[in-house]
């Protein structure tokens, strides 16, 4: 949801601006627009990642745990949500960085990075799955074969979510490296202060959600309306704490406006 509503939309919005600056050979304008896009993405995506990771089980239970969708199925699905959410910043930042290539009519570089990420994803899948099997599966169970092990031992699919996240970070690193090598973008000043304040705001929100989860009931055993009520309280409370922390740390609405 955060990626579709914000990440992709932001990349679409800044593409014509970056293209205009590139055509006008306005390096400063190109740099400021892309820099704004990166900061705006992080302001939204980091708390979304943290919220999805901490509230994975409450979210899955509230939406899906009805009928034959059991509590155990909710827990296993939450593992996938947790793993994939870890890669959300990379997914979103890739969508923000890609227009910097498309604006310069460079479609080859994103394809190269995407292919490398796809190959890495397959390698990460195998490596992480093997690691989890070595850590979680008893020796006697491994003798039954790979497919039997996957069917009998719950939670091994967690490796697939983490592998997707790691391959997305690799995609981002490659794109960033090649963008810097192209020498068309200057990182704007103030990033250290920006990141410190942003991390502190996310820390405040994360602590608020953690304390809220200690008070909240087990989402897999309560009824539908209690799940909805508690999830709404946790999401609303976390968002409120994040907004207040951002204001206290000096963030203002103008930080969301394109320069």
Language model: regions and residue ranges:
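Membrane-embedded alpha-helical bundles of multi-pass transporters/translocases
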Residues: 1-259
């Amino acid at each position: 949801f955060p990626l579709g509503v914000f990440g992709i939309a932001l990349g679409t919005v800044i593409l014509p601006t970056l293209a205009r600056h590139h055509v006008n050979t306005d390096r400063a304008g190109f740099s400021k627009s892309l820099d704004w896009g990166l900061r705006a993405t992080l302001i939204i995506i980091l708390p979304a990642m943290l919220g999805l990771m901490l509230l994975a089980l409450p979210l899955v239970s509230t939406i899906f745990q009805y009928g034959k969708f059991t509590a155990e199925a909710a827990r296993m699905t939450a593992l996938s949500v947790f793993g994939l959410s870890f890669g959300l910043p990379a997914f979103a930042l890739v969508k923000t960085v890609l227009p910097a290539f498309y604006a310069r009519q460079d479609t080859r570089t994103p394809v190269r990075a995407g292919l490398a990420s796809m190959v890495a994803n397959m390698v990460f899948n195998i490596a992480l799955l093997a690691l989890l099997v070595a850590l979680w599966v008893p020796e006697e169970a491994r003798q039954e074969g790979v497919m039997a092990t996957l069917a009998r031992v719950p939670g091994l699919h967690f490796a697939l979510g983490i592998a997707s996240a790691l391959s997305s970070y690799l995609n981002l690193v490659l794109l960033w490296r090649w963008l810097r090598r192209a020498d068309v973008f200057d990182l704007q000043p103030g990033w250290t202060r920006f990141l410190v304040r942003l991390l502190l705001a996310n820390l405040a929100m994360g602590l608020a959600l953690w304390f809220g989860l200690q008070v909240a009931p087990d989402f897999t055993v309560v009824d539908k309306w209690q799940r909805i009520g508690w999830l709404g309280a946790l999401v609303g409370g976390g968002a409120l704490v994040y907004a207040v922390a951002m204001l206290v740390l000096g963030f203002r609405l103008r930080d969301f406006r394109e320069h």
